[in-house]
Amino acid sequence: MALNLQDKQAIVAEVNEAAKGALSAVVADSRGVTVEKMTELRKSAREAGVTMRVVRNTLLRRAVEGTEFECLTDTFTGPTLIAFSNEHPGAAARLFTEFAKTNKEFELKGAAFEGKVQNVEFLATLPTYEEAIARLMGTMKEAAAGKLVRTFAALRDKLQEAA
């Protein structure tokens, strides 16, 4: 279906707004994926706070112009599905990576974070805020426990020397 100029401008404006508010973006090719599977992916994306859109490449190039996702323009070939992570930088990458494991036709093209092209796997493995805090607390707890053990060992050694 042919789009008139107003429709094209609306699409560019909508994608540009999504890009400006996003933390990261992931680009994929969804050729060969069934409508049922794509519907499931869209539902999962909404739940994860990810904005997804299939956009013509020329419109997508205009939409990301001047944003930190302009570095992805080389990946805009063929049918392009773009997802913007709004809440966590790794949300879209994690969602697409999991989806690609079960759908061999789904091809990940690239990702961007903080104005640079990134590996999709790198973004997918970024810990969430809660996971990062848990890791930090675990490290701090281990350090404190280790210091306590070393203190008791030093005290034991000192008492053995005195005896």
Swiss-Prot record:
Annotated PROSITE patterns: RIBOSOMAL_L10
One Pfam family linked to the record? Ribosomal_L10
> Which controlled-vocabulary keywords does the entry list?
Ribonucleoprotein, Ribosomal protein, RNA-binding, rRNA-binding
Among InterPro entries, the record links this protein to: Ribosomal_uL10 (IPR001790), Ribosomal_uL10-like_sf (IPR043141), Ribosomal_uL10_bac (IPR022973), Ribosomal_uL10_bac_type (IPR047865), Ribosomal_uL10_CS_bac (IPR002363)
Q: Which GO terms describe its molecular function?
A: large ribosomal subunit rRNA binding; structural constituent of ribosome
From its record, what is one biological process in GO terms?
translation
- Subunit (UniProt): Part of the ribosomal stalk of the 50S ribosomal subunit. The N-terminus interacts with L11 and the large rRNA to form the base of the stalk. The C-terminus forms an elongated spine to which L12 dimers bind in a sequential fashion forming a multimeric L10(L12)X complex.
Q: What does this protein do?
A: Forms part of the ribosomal stalk, playing a central role in the interaction of the ribosome with GTP-bound translation factors.
Q: What is the name listed in the Swiss-Prot or TrEMBL entry for this protein?
A: Large ribosomal subunit protein uL10
Q: Show the taxonomic lineage.
A: Bacteria, Pseudomonadati, Pseudomonadota, Gammaproteobacteria, Pasteurellales
